[in-house]
């Protein structure tokens, strides 16, 4: 499949996502009840391979994220930390081949942007140049402000990510809801403002209280993408494997299951195995045949 895009065919771009912001910044004291049905929330999901990416794209997903969650749900790592740039590039290339309409965002893995900023920008360039990503996602708030600005200066669109940032797993002491105290909530507000000021075109809010996410969403001019952050965000994202019942480990509270693909696979494999062992597969209709002439000549050769 060609990776050339035709904007006239509904290709979603970074400006399109920016234009999907569903409200204007409000007063800090103004409450936000954004549950109206007229909102065009941004639909985001993860993908890690060509067929899944193509299915998501054809289903109308707005943003496809090649998340570093691939390390856990596909590669079997205990967490996202061991994932390398090369592994992420490999999966991003595969997803690129399946995505034509959606905006393709690639996660910057742990260690790829934590040291020298110039090296971090070079790593981000690789995702765009070598793998076809249209944006990268960077975890962190205020402490990543200069880095995000430098990437944006290099014309690399950046999606921010604050709250529960899985790459900070050890610092947080596990996968825990963030922003529950006043001090922590205020820090996340500062983080969100810093990410916006640095030039990010959107920001993921993960595992934070609904009320805090609503406050951040009402203050920012860029779209917020929630994952365990309540319905007031401008969009939502889930790890696909959690949503379709294909995760083998713990499924977060915020992940609604829309299918049980894992169970379907188990049943299908068990049925296949039984048919093979009992000689029921393959059947005649699943087999190829010689013509009668060739069959007779072959039998004659065997008798001679």
Q: Which residues make up each language-model segment?
A:
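Alpha/beta enzyme core
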Residues: 2-25, 33-292, 297, 301-304
């Amino acid at each position: 499949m060609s990776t050339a895009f035709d904007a006239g065919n509904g290709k979603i771009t970074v400006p399109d996502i920016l234009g999907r912001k569903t409200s204007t910044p409000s007063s800090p004291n103004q409450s936000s009840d954004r549950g109206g049905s007229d909102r065009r929330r941004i639909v985001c999901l993860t993908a890690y391979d060509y067929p899944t990416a193509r299915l998501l794209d054809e289903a109308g997903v707005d943003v496809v994220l090649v998340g570093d969650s691939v390390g856990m749900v596909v590669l079997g790592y205990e967490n996202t930390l061991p994932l390398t740039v090369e592994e992420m590039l490999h999966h991003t290339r595969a997803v690129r081949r399946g995505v034509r309409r959606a905006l393709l965002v690639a996660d910057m893995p742990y260690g790829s942007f934590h040291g020298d900023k110039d090296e971090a920008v070079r790593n981000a360039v690789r995702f765009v140049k070598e793998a076809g990503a249209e944006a990268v996602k960077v975890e962190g708030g205020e402490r990543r402000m200069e880095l995000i600005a430098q990437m944006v200066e290099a014309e690399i669109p950046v999606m921010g990510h604050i709250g529960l940032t899985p790459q900070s797993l050890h610092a947080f002491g596990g996968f825990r809801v963030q922003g529950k105290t006043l001090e922590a909530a205020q820090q996340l507000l500062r983080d969100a403002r810093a990410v916006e000021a640095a030039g990010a075109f959107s920001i993921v809010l993960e595992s934070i209280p609904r009320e805090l996410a609503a406050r951040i969403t009402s203050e920012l001019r860029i779209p917020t993408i929630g994952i365990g952050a309540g319905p007031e965000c401008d969009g939502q994202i889930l790890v696909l494997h959690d949503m379709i019942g294909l995760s083998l480990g713990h499924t977060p509270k915020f992940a609604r299951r829309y299918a049980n693909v894992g169970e379907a696979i188990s049943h299908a494999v068990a049925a296949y195995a039984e048919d093979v062992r009992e000689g029921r597969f393959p059947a005649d209709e699943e087999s190829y045949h010689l013509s009668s002439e060739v069959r007779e000549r072959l039998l004659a050769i065997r008798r001679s």
